Amino acid sequence: MNRNLLIALSLVPASLVFAADPLYQAKGDHARTYVHPNAAEPQPYRIFVPSTWEPGKTMPLVVVLHGGGSNQNTPFERNDNILAKEAEKHGFIVVSPLGGGPSGGYGASYAPVFAPGANRPPPNPGATPETPARRISESDVMMVTERTAEEYGVDRKRIYLMGNSMGSMGTLYLAQKYQGKWCAIGPSDGPVVPSSYEYDRVTYLSGAIFVHGDHDTLASIDATREMVQSFRKAGIETKFVEVKDGTHTGSWADVLPGTFDFFDAHRCGR
């Protein structure tokens, strides 16, 4: 995302940015939109704010990236909206951006690592040379993160990032690009080529929790295992949760309480 644009946005008073939004500082589960300066139409995102939040109260934030072919609502639809339930229980604000579209890639250029014999989908836009759509996808995540942090006064030292499949690759990409932005990360069922990753760029993280289902027939669990070892060698506290009978799309939700526990235990800035 253009750094000058981020600086300019940070100087705009919140009262002006949200003046026309009837859901400004609303609690609960809501569908929201905002105007992205480079997108053809308003960009949607989904947000959950715990009932215990009130103006002036600081809470941590979890940014959740959906998988390819999905949208900002998909993470909330798994396991009877366990995402909102765990956020309420742990006292976290959760936001899920669209990322510019169902398969925007969040700016990542990594090639996916498939499981042996996987029925490979068409190439993901996230694995192609940089395009305007990819730039919008990346900046959408960062703008929604900033918008939410400004609106709800979140603890900026406790912003966490997680995602599944394409969202996992986006998580890994944004973690190494925006150093110091994230406290800890949670990639699931979406490794990148282990030898291609810049582990030295994520040593600032307080921790990483990787999740992968042992019945994932699309993404390589062996590649995830290799990434876990490389994270540990880089000195990052790393947990690996291998989900028994876990599938490509559902494993992350099956063990989500543990992911929130992990994030809650990793409190940056203290």
Which residues are covered by each model-predicted region?
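C-terminal catalytic histidine-bearing segment of alpha/beta-hydrolase fold enzymes
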Residues: A208-V211, T217-R270
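Alpha/beta-hydrolase fold active-site loops
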Residues: P60, F92, C183, S206-G207
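Alpha/beta-hydrolase
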Residues: L65, P187-S188, V243
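Bacterial N-terminal signal peptides
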Residues: I7-S15
